[in-house]
Amino acid sequence: EYPYEGQILVDGTDLQAMDEADRTKRIGYLGHDPELFFDSVENNILLGDKKEADDYLKAVCMEQEVAEMADGKKTVVGNGGVRLSGGQAKRLALARTLCHKKPVLILDDPFSALDKNTEKQIFANLKQQTKDNIVFLISHRLYLFPQMNQVIWMEDGKAVAGTHEEILEKIPEYRSLYETQSDERENAKVETENRKTVSEHTEE
């Protein structure tokens, strides 16, 4: 039932000793393909709680997009409602997760389909909103990893944990992936600056 050896302790309690209700109370999970309810944007976030949805829409950089919808926060989404992009659906689901955040959060690639600036802002907001939580972030965006307290490298059923710098030293594959992504980001930045320069010269 549990595909690992040893113990995983949450607040001193073995994960295997918890019943389903206890695990649900302590651990929140946002999957790679989250489901939205056929309901308003607001209700998808609050799930009946008496809170302000605006705070969570702002945290996921979605307040302006929702304000521009025909019915704003009352706009019905989900299967049969207004169709959202993949990135919008993920951000709305992340807003719901933050509204009902548990002591431990597992987030599976919540920043996919986002532009870099939006991604950076949401990540900064996420850090602010979860200062008192343990967050496991599963992501392909390795440029974020230097900001993590710990990085966990998992391969062949084994895990190695440490700071970003420690994992760079211990795991050659991690270093290779990180440096490859760094080179790709730098090349993309140069291309963008070159296009901007060409555009400015053309306008002159």
Q: Residue spans of the language-model regions?
A:
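ABC nucleotide-binding domain signature
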Residues: 21, 25-32, 134-136
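A residue-level structural signal marking coil residues immediately N-terminal to beta-strands
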Residues: 102-103, 133
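C-terminal portion of ABC ATPase nucleotide-binding domains
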Residues: 72, 124, 128-131, 137, ...
